């Protein structure tokens, strides 16, 4: 262990112990509060010539935390810096180092991203010094992302309460964090230390063991520190749990239960509803169910089976936690493996872009579907049932379903809404409860800017997750098949913004040089869509297309295939055309790449951020010339292979599942 401390004769009243790890970008609030503490009038009056020290213990940070603290400690005689010899992975060892080096009458543990409350600490010190308490606890101010503050962990006590009565009051009404004012002599006398082998619940174990040995406990009705709650799952130092965390959780709970049992108490009865509810919500969110051993799950479940008599009487606030505790108590491993997965609800009126991902999502999630028959119609009882069930809610399309869910989602649930493109012309984004939405998903980078500009959404909530492809599921083109180089396709020619006439113009230009070129039109013809007949502009456009075909003798060169299974057919067509005026991402040409062929694009806005720029052409003439230049099979296959790799590396379904998983677990 290295240190940067001074040998001082000063007798400190208070030692503030601050463990740090990779905190260089978030320690400002903590440092500011400590700098202000020394000049706080009430504290100065209380301490007189005596004062306090601050001990920073860096857990071998890999960023600039140590260097930043080293520079700051050189400015203050009462600030000292220590560093572990290697990263220990938890605050336990740094806190123990702080206990060993502290010289104050009292010790206070402060996390490096929180701030100390000068008023509360002064009151706690005054009470401790007056009544010689072993420890003094206070409330906590929670700062939600700098936008909202609330006071938690307030309890009612009286001056004549015994230590045991204080323990009951504290355990019933507070989370047992270690941020209390501790008498240093009390900690040393009872050899009270944090368990360095425990990363989950280490402060709970320490606090319960210490309170069990205390004979005098005080409380001040003021916050001792401000807990700076961060967005994006920032409540926990770890964002993914493994079997080790499961074992540590229940081991910690059992040790706490044993400590309370020494006084004839049960922590599970006093606070188990909140401790287990909170912890299991984190387990559900952060445990990767595909990466945990059966033995770890069995060890975890055994705790719930052992205490099922107590747990049976507890009604947890989270519905999923209730069901999970019941299954853990029963101990059936197969059922536990399923119930411990997060519950994902997919909702919306047209789920064709999301449903194919469900089988893969089910490896990590329980998945249910609330599919609305139309954009506005749904069975409300069905939606309410699955809303009550869900942990995470994915609403497809920024339409009526997104508004409905935003008005009803619980604060503990995570709601995300995916916008494709056409929603920009609707007003649902103006109606949505913005505070209830954790993230808005767009399918292309340019759609992010469109969404923010149209609805003025918070930029921090707008994310880009591209559409997915089952890149390995397409029938692959025969690399020796030269005929496919003369076969064009357009997937979806209606409405007119899809640019069908421009596709015909490309075909006509190609046939001027080589009559082998043909065009296949996949999807419904305009003649099959009644709404086209009722739209004069659309009707006139497709009449012009028919006239162009006849005028340029293309009748035998254009095939209307109707609906086709693109997984099985797109390999036959060397070029799939994207002629649109505007798109979100345009899936069809991407399918061509997946099958070992090529997608070619006119420059609709944002296309260069979705597909390779080398496949984007300024106009019809440039696109036609490129296709002619690709009549060399070797050149064609080289570009096709590059496009195939691009699709796999950027848009494969496995990447989409990982992106969704990361979004929900960190939203």
Task: Please tell me what each predicted stretch does.
Residues 84-102:
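Glycine-rich, basic loop-to-helix element that forms the pyrophosphate-binding segment
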Residues 77-80, 533-562:
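Nucleotide-activated donor-binding/catalytic signature segment of Leloir-type glycosyltransferases, i.e.
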């Amino acid at each position: 262990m290295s240190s940067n401390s001074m040998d001082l004769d000063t007798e400190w009243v208070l030692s503030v112990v601050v463990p740090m790890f990779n905190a260089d970008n978030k320690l400002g609030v903590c440092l500011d509060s400590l700098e202000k503490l020394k000049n706080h009038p009430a504290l100065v009056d209380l301490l007189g010539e005596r004062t306090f020290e601050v001990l920073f213990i860096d857990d071998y940070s890999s960023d600039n935390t140590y260097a930043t603290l080293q520079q700051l400690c050189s400015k203050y005689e009462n600030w000292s810096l220590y560093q572990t010899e290697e990263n220990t992975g938890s605050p336990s060892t740094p806190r123990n180092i702080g206990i060993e080096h502290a010289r104050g009458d009292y010790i206070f543990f402060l996390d490096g991203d929180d701030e100390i409350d000068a008023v509360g600490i002064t009151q706690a010190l005054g009470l401790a010094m007056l009544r010689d308490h072993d420890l003094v606890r206070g409330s906590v101010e929670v700062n939600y992302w700098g936008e909202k503050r609330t006071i938690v962990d307030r309890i009612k006590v009286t001056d004549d309460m015994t230590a045991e009565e204080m323990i009951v009051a504290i355990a019933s009404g507070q989370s047992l964090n270690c941020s209390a004012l501790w008498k240093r002599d009390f900690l040393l006398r009872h050899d009270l230390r944090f368990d360095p082998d425990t990363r989950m619940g280490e402060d709970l174990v320490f606090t319960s063991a210490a309170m069990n040995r205390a004979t005098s406990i005080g409380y001040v009705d003021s916050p001792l520190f401000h807990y700076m709650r961060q967005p994006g799952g920032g409540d926990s130092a770890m964002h993914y749990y493994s079997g080790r965390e499961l074992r540590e959780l229940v081991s910690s709970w059992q040790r706490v239960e044993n400590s309370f049992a020494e006084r004839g108490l049960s922590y599970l009865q006093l606070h188990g509803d909140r401790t287990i509810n909170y912890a299991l919500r984190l387990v559900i969110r952060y445990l990767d169910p595909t990466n945990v051993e059966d033995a770890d799950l069995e060890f975890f479940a055994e705790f719930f089976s052992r205490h099922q008599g107590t747990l049976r009487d507890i009604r947890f606030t989270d519905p999923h936690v209730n069901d999970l505790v019941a299954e853990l108590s029963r101990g059936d491993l197969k059922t536990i493996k399923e119930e411990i997965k997060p519950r994902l609800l997919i909702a919306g009126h047209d789920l064709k872009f999301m449903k194919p991902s469900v089988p893969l999502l089910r490896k990590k999630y329980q998945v249910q579907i609330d599919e609305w028959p139309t954009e506005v119609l749904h069975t409300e009882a069905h939606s309410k049932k699955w809303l009550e069930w869900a942990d995470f809610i994915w609403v497809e399309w920024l339409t009526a379903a997104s508004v409905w869910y935003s008005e009803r989602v619980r604060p503990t649930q995570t709601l995300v809404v995916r916008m494709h493109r056409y929603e920009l012309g609707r007003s649902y984004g103006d109606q949505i409860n913005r505070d209830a939405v954790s993230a808005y998903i767009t399918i292309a980078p340019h759609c992010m800017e469109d969404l923010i500009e149209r609805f003025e959404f918070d930029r921090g909530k707008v994310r880009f997750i591209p559409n997915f492809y089952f890149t390995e599921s397409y029938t692959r083109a025969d690399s020796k098949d030269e005929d496919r180089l003369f076969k064009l396709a357009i997937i979806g020619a209606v409405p007119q913004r899809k640019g069908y006439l421009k596709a015909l113009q490309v075909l006509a230009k190609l046939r001027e040089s080589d009559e082998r070129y043909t065009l296949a039109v996949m999807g419904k013809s305009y003649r099959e869509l009644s709404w086209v007949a009722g739209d004069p502009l659309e009707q006139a456009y497709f009449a012009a297309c028919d006239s162009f075909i006849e005028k340029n003798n293309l009748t035998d060169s254009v095939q209307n295939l109707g609906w086709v299974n693109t997984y099985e057919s797109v390999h036959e067509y060397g070029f799939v055309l994207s002629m649109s005026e505007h798109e979100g991402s345009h899936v069809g040409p991407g399918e061509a790449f997946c099958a070992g062929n090529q997608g070619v694009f006119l420059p609709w806005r944002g296309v260069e951020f979705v597909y390779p720029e080398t496949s984007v052409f300024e106009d019809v003439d440039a696109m036609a010339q490129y296709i002619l230049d690709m009549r060399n099979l070797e050149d064609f296959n080289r570009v096709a292979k590059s496009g195939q790799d691009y699709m796999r590396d950027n848009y494969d379904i496995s990447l989409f599942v990982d992106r969704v998983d990361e979004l929900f677990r960190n939203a």
